[in-house]
Design a protein with these regions (language model features):
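Residues within well-ordered beta-strands of beta-sheet-rich folds
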Residues: 5-7, 26, 198-200
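Non-catalytic DNA-recognition/assembly elements of restriction-modification systems
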Residues: 11-109, 205-246
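DNA target-recognition domains and sequence-specific DNA-contacting regions of bacterial/archaeal
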Residues: 1-3, 71-198
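Compact, glycine/acidic-enriched structural inserts
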Residues: 6-11, 184-185, 204
Length: 246
């Protein structure tokens, strides 16, 4: 390691530290501008809590919780799996580009994007969907049609008529809290196991409070994004100050 050589910018035979600092500063400024544009486009710049969201956070300790079997609140969907070695045989350039999911924990489980024949496409209506991979307990949310890597049925595809992005995030949090401590590679979260797994959800008279879950997640998102927005604002202000001085 001590004899390894690395390439660095130089000037007059000396490492050009000033150039490196300026280069990194410019890259950071570009990313901050992109972040600001993204926050504006998605409406995430507004991190002010509504009264309903404040109430959801303040009243969390007083909310009643009940344990539900996953099978009682989410529906298992039939799935079409693909052998990765046969992707070329399934290509159809007339189809739209959709994500191809595996069981990896990186990139949200997406291996690639492909145009394949309609017969192997899952979730054609683009419904809110939760994937749970039994080998590593990885949990993924999606709301697009998708392709699924052959895992011998190791992936559970879950939906519900009441499921949307916000309450799905709450469901996933509750599910992961249980399965990450209960299952492992040697004790897999199989479909039979998952169906009978109990998760804790806010409820009233035995019915999950879907609306409360949505408001609660929205409030938590705003609390998190507030720090991101304030960080971006500070960086943008600092960049403008440097530009003004120069």
């Amino acid at each position: 390691f001590l004899t390894a050589k690395i390439h660095l910018p130089t000037q007059n035979g000396q490492i050009d530290f000033a150039f490196m600092e300026q280069f990194i500063a410019e890259l950071e400024a570009e990313r901050i501008v992109e972040l600001e544009a993204y926050l504006q486009a998605t409406g995430l710049q507004d991190y002010t809590l509504t009264k309903e969201e404040e109430k959801a956070l303040q009243g969390f300790e007083g909310v009643e919780f009940e344990e539900f079997r996953i099978e009682d609140v989410l529906d298992w969907q039939p799935q079409k799996e693909i052998d990765p070695l046969k992707l070329d045989n399934l290509k159809d350039v007339n189809q739209k580009l959709y994500p191809f999911y595996g069981q990896a924990t990186i990139n949200n489980g997406i291996i690639s994007y492909n145009q394949l024949v309609d017969e192997v496409l899952n979730n054609k209506e683009g419904k809110s969907t939760i994937l749970i991979h039994s080998n590593n307990q990885n949990t993924v949310y999606l709301e697009t049609p998708f392709y699924l890597k052959d895992g011998h049925g190791a992936t559970s595809v879950l939906q519900s008529e009441k499921l949307n992005k916000l309450n799905a995030l709450y469901f996933m949090s509750s599910i992961k809290k249980v399965i990450l401590s209960k299952y492992s590679y040697n004790a897999k979260a199989t479909k039979i196991e998952l169906k009978n797994t109990l998760i804790s959800l806010p409820s009233s008279q035995g019915v999950p409070l879907y609306a409360y879950m949505e408001v609660f997640i929205k409030a938590v998102q705003k609390l998190v994004i507030k720090e991101v927005v304030e960080y971006a604002d500070r960086k943008i202000a600092a960049s403008r100050e440097v530009v003004t001085k120069t």
